[in-house]
């Protein structure tokens, strides 16, 4: 790339300080920061180099770049990681059709949008995992651990460590697939302890018949709110809408991914959702108190967090 071509008015280049050493730093910074391409600040897009100079807290205009001249590639990466908390976003596809799944493609499009804004993303296909049915034993309430030993434990750790989630399911008789429902049923202590508090979710649904995806989206929105997550947005499309609708859905999904990353970075507050989340939090706290002698782990969890 030509560093001069990327810097606009008011930048170091336009101020006449883009000398040869600085060019080297710009190129070095670029190579350390490909994951941050198209990062936006105040709704404005910048080049890789401009983003990195912002992220490591060096003013763009009329500054001495001498401190950077001694930094190695690894040092710059270390500075970037220290200054910017990388977002982790997990996509969960509940369609059993693998690479043929339209739902999977839309989930991936959301993840691509988030990735373009600096997020680290991962896509999981539920159909590839062995997740058994919940047997309502109540062990998770008592100990915080599930009695079952399968792939759910690994997936659950990823869910809890993620900053954002992208949930995708096709319409199966006016609801999510069996794979999605089985996973949700294994998350009972998640709702009691509101363990997705502070996270953001995008829900994606597809259907054959016109409008049938709406029920699926409504269901997933309600579930994720009950778990404590904000809903950044949702997207649905049906086969009856035609090929053009699918193409448009892909574009919308990418934009939703960008918005999801922005929400996480800015810690966006949705006022109406916040009211629901506060109500849910109080409701489940009271429920846990009522069964404190049986739901030992959950009571201890809320005690540890001062019931906040």
Q: Predicted segment positions?
A:
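Short, glycine-/small-residue-rich phosphate/pyrophosphate-handling segment
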Residues: 196-235
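Low-complexity, intrinsically disordered or signal/transmembrane-proximal segments
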Residues: 27, 46-50, 73
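Extreme N-terminal basic, low-complexity initiation segments
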Residues: 1-12
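N-terminal beta1-alpha1-beta2 submodule of the flavodoxin-like/Rossmannoid cofactor-binding fold
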Residues: 76-169, 174-182, 188-189, 251-261, ...
